A protein has these predicted regions:
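Alpha-helical DNA-contacting segments of helix-turn-helix folds
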Residues: 31, 66-73, 80, 122, ...
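Hydrophobic alpha-helical connector segments
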Residues: 82-115, 167
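Amphipathic alpha-helical packing segments from all-alpha helical-bundle domains
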Residues: 95, 99, 110-111, 127-154, ...
Length: 207
């Protein structure tokens, strides 16, 4: 676990991989608090207590850093979706599968509401070196839910083909509006959240 004392180590005290993790963690915290536009490589060096040269050994440029923070943001979303699944019903029934589908959709929207600055960066495409795959992957969590719905007969084979794009677009679009504060007050947003999730079920003819 990374703590503030961890982030104050000198260059020599960090193992190669540890420093990269610390830098991404610091970048993630910064974006969550201050937004994307103020993120910088030299600033991260100051926060983590290492030299700018050490930072540049891990990130060729700002685009590379932003890509890494974007990946970490997607992983925060993935963890929120998995946490929602842990709290959802576990029964291997149609109702259970639908409840789990709704729970991950709700978590996606909550990510936009509660972590709007991370939402802003999570799905931006940056010109950077290839990174390891996102894990946990929000897309894979959605796909697993849709496969379960299909196997239980809640989602037809025909609708399964377009279900990922439709479900993702509906929830992602609403989460984006919520992140910008465009869905009204807390009560109105909660009501609209329920509506969009129910609309996703209807659009995919899940029953």
């Amino acid at each position: 676990m990374l703590t503030m004392s961890t982030l104050k180590k000198s260059d020599a005290e960090f193992h190669h991989g540890d420093l990269q993790v610390a830098l991404v963690t610091a970048g993630l915290r910064h974006v969550e608090k201050h937004g994307l536009n103020s993120l910088g490589l030299r600033q991260l060096a100051l926060v983590t207590g290492v030299s700018p040269t050490a930072v540049y050994r891990h990130f060729a440029d700002l685009e590379h850093l932003k890509a890494s923070v974007a990946k970490a943001s997607r992983e925060v979303l993935g963890k929120m979706m998995l946490d929602a699944l842990k709290s959802a019903p576990t029964s291997k029934t149609a109702k259970g599968a639908i409840d789990r589908f709704l729970s991950i959709g709700g978590a996606y929207i909550d990510f936009g509401i509660k972590k709007s600055n991370l939402y802003e960066i999570a799905f931006i495409c940056f010109d950077s070196p290839d990174l390891e795959p996102t894990s946990p992957s929000p897309w894979e969590i959605l796909m697993q839910s849709l496969v379960e719905l299909n196997e239980l007969g809640c989602l037809s084979d025909k609708n399964f083909k377009t279900a990922p794009t439709i479900a993702w677009s509906m929830v992602h679009g609403f989460a984006g509006l919520a992140a910008q504060g465009a869905t009204g007050n807390a009560g109105e947003t909660l009501a609209s959240k329920r509506d969009i999730l129910m609309a996703a079920l209807k659009a995919l003819d899940i029953k």
